[in-house]
């Protein structure tokens, strides 16, 4: 059979399964691939459960995470789906954004209802900005009592509402991942119903190219007679020659300038877009006016800040992290995009210290401003060695 070619025509969405241990996240992931394979064989191959469960370890910024990646297609969309076998892997993945999610399938066993990790994953989803959730009420074949199913559904909705998800409107679909995986037609249909809910309740993400222009500066140099050139990889948006931009971060004030030329691989271009490695010639700026760590952006689209609340995972000793805990007023470097800035950490009330391998909330006060928005990722470093990773949850100043 000819290999199905990757069609660019379909919208692409990143999702993942979250929820308490043994509630059936991995079984559900395998069942989705099986049911979609049976329904659209030319679009999908089935993934075996044990392949997903024995997820290969990945190292992202020094953090070891087991993540299984599967892909599949519904009629409407192409999905990349992540599933993590261990609870610690989920926490690390969600905080560090190793695999970004546009939405999540929250798996809750109808036999148990919401459990501690269910709640923990929902809290994390809220904090790290997983924007949409669809609920799979799994093992529904094992609960005879309709009232009990309704009760569990109500509990899940209340849990979601208490963390600012629209609990009353979130789709809750009763499924049996195991039965569907075994090929039971009726439960297979319920799984299709779940995927229809995912298709409709998780909106298509805004593509990087449609967002406001942003390029982190990696390098700065002068071309005699022409001016100052900055290089970097365009993170989002589109830039045209002669467009006005703003240089933001590190320095106390932002600077507006015009891009008079865009080059890629030594060729002059009219435009640059998300994903391009580009060199931009900036009008009227001296070599000392710009530096690595700043960003070139669409004017007014992002602002510099020094204080934020973050959620971070601190590497364990085995991952090459610290061997000892840290305390209030810890002063590491925070690495944003292309540069390190020193920051002072304040721990939440009641937290005396943070151990290697923990995840924690923290308030950070940076000594220089960084172009920042909620969701921005950072690494925590000591002398160039990564000891943690996290993201901005809320900007304070």
Swiss-Prot record:
Subcellular localization(s) per the UniProt record: Cytoplasm
Q: What is its EC number?
A: 3.6.5.3
Q: Which reaction does it catalyse?
A: GTP + H2O = GDP + phosphate + H(+)
Write out the ranges of the annotated region (G4). 138-141
What keyword terms does UniProt attach to this protein? Cytoplasm, Elongation factor, GTP-binding, Hydrolase, Magnesium, Metal-binding, Nucleotide-binding, Protein biosynthesis
This protein's GO cellular component annotations are: cytosol
A molecular-function term among this protein's GO annotations: translation elongation factor activity
Region described as G3: spans on this chain: 83-86
Domain called tr-type G: residue spans: 10-206
**Spans annotated as G5:** 176-178
- Tell me which Pfam families the record gives: GTP_EFTU, GTP_EFTU_D2, GTP_EFTU_D3
Q: Which residues bind GTP?
A: 19-26, 83-87, 138-141
Q: Where is this region: G2?
A: 62-66
Broadest EC class assigned to this enzyme: hydrolase
Q: Where is this region: G1?
A: 19-26
Question: Is Metal-binding among the key words of this record?
Answer: yes
Identify the residues that bind Mg(2+). Answer: 26
- How would you summarize the oligomeric state and partners of this protein? Monomer.
Task: Family membership, please give it.
Answer: Belongs to the TRAFAC class translation factor GTPase superfamily. Classic translation factor GTPase family. EF-Tu/EF-1A subfamily.
Q: What does this protein do?
A: GTP hydrolase that promotes the GTP-dependent binding of aminoacyl-tRNA to the A-site of ribosomes during protein biosynthesis.
For this entry, the protein name equals Elongation factor Tu
Species name for this entry?
Answer: Kineococcus radiotolerans (strain ATCC BAA-149 / DSM 14245 / SRS30216)
The major lineage groups are: Bacteria, Bacillati, Actinomycetota, Actinomycetes, Kineosporiales
């Amino acid at each position: 059979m000819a290999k199905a070619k990757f069609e660019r025509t379909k919208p692409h969405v990143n999702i993942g399964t979250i929820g308490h241990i043994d509630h059936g996240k991995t079984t559900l992931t395998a069942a989705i691939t099986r049911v979609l394979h049976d329904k659209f064989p030319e679009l999908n191959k089935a993934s075996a459960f044990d392949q997903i469960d024995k997820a290969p370890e990945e190292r992202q910024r020094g953090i070891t995470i087991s993540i299984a990646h599967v892909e599949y297609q519904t009629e409407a969309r192409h999905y990349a789906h992540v599933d993590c076998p261990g609870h610690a892997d989920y926490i690390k993945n969600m905080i560090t954004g190793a695999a970004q999610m546009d939405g999540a399938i929250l798996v809750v066993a109808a036999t148990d209802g919401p459990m501690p990790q269910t709640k923990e994953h929902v809290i994390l989803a809220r904090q790290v900005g997983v924007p949409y959730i669809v609920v799979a009420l799994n093992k529904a074949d094992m609960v005879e009592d309709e009232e009990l199913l309704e009760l569990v559904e109500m509990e899940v909705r209340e849990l979601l509402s208490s963390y600012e998800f629209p609990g009353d409107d979130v789709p809750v679909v009763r499924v049996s991942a195991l039965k569907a995986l075994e090929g039971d037609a009726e439960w297979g249909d319920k799984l299709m119903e779940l995927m229809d809910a995912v298709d409709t309740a998780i909106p298509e993400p805004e593509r990087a190219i449609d967002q406001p222009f942003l390029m982190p500066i990696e390098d700065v140099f002068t071309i005699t007679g022409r001016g100052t050139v900055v290089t970097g990889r365009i993170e989002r948006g589109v830039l045209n020659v002669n467009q006005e931009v703003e240089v933001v971060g590190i320095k106390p004030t932002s600077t507006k300038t015009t891009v008079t030329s865009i080059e890629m691989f030594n060729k002059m271009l009219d435009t640059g877009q998300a994903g391009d490695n580009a060199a931009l010639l900036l009008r009227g700026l001296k070599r000392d006016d710009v530096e690595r760590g700043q960003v070139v952006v669409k004017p007014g689209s992002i602002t510099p800040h020094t204080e934020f609340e973050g959620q971070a995972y601190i590497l364990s000793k085995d991952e090459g992290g610290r061997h000892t805990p840290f305390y209030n007023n810890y002063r590491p470097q925070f690495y944003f995009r292309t540069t390190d800035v020193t920051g002072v950490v304040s721990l939440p009330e009641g937290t005396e210290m943070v151990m290697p391998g923990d995840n924690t909330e923290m308030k950070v006060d940076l000594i220089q401003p960084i172009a920042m928005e909620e969701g921005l990722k950072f690494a925590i470093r000591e002398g160039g060695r990564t000891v943690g990773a996290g993201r901005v949850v809320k900007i304070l100043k």
